[in-house]
Curated annotation (Swiss-Prot):
InterPro entries (UniProt xref): SH2, SH2_dom_sf, SOCS3_SH2, SOCS_box, SOCS_box-like_dom_sf
Species for this entry: Canis lupus familiaris (Dog)
Residue stretches of biased makeup (Pro residues): 131-142
Gene that produces this protein: SOCS3
Pathway named in the protein's UniProt entry: Protein modification; protein ubiquitination
The protein, known as: Suppressor of cytokine signaling 3
Nucleotide-binding is among the record's keywords: no
């Protein structure tokens, strides 16, 4: 069974059909925020559109821990879900859209501020470790739910400190590790080059020095993943 979505499947360019989305938009600005997110997700290659949680579990079952994908949420209160393979199996994390930003649904008892972003790709990139960074070991289990943040651990020499994030599910406390997206299609050479360029543009001045056509192409997808 496939959950209907008002958004087309990844890679398709037909107009959005607003009659099929179960969750309604709270404002015109939220509608535009979600439409922009979908456009970039379709370019990403790891947006699996209307697959269900069960189908996501099958897709990720043979993949190593840290593999993830983005799909339409089956929950009528949300637009997107992050499905990630962990050492304890596939976990599904709802992506909240409120106040003009996206965030992972967090543990309501946590006192830490929830990281928020104007783009789903930026949200995903935030939770990915930098190149060469080690994975965090699993801490002792404790009952809770959703996602929580903990202070940075002692970094290795030459590496900046990084906060650890954990998934709370069924009494387990599982490190949230996003290592590799699961591709839904074969990326073009242009897109691969664009991701590489995005990963090396660390200042606005560098972007403004590029030709206008290249800047426009980069603006359509401004993430390195």
């Amino acid at each position: 069974m496939v959950t209907h979505s008002k958004f087309p499947a990844a890679g398709m360019s037909r107009p959005l059909d607003t009659s099929l989305r179960l969750k309604t938009f709270s404002s015109k600005s939220e509608y535009q925020l979600v439409v922009n997110a979908v456009c970039k997700l379709q370019e990403s290659g790891f947006y699996w559109s209307a697959v269900t949680g069960g189908e996501a579990n099958l897709l990720l079952s043979a993949e190593p821990a840290g593999t993830f994908l983005i799909r339409d949420s089956s929950d009528q209160r949300h637009f997107f879900t992050l499905s990630v393979k962990t050492q304890s199996g596939t976990k599904n994390l709802r992506i909240q859209c409120e106040g003009g930003s996206f965030s992972l649904q967090s543990d309501p008892r946590s006192t830490q501020p929830v990281p928020r972003f104007d783009c789903v790709l930026k949200l995903v990139h935030h939770y990915m470790p930098p190149p060469g960074a080690p994975s965090f070991p699993a801490p002792p289990t404790e009952p809770s739910s959703e996602v929580s943040e903990q202070p940075p651990s002692q970094p290795l020499p030459g590496n900046p400190p990084r906060r650890a994030y954990y998934i709370y599910s069924g009494g387990e406390k599982i490190p949230l590790v996003l290592s590799r997206p699961l591709s839904s299609n074969v990326a073009t050479l242009q897109h691969l080059c664009r991701k590489t360029v995005n990963g090396h543009l660390d200042s606005y001045e560098k972007v403004t020095q590029l030709p206008g056509a290249i800047r426009e192409f980069l603006d359509q997808y401004d993430a390195p993943l």
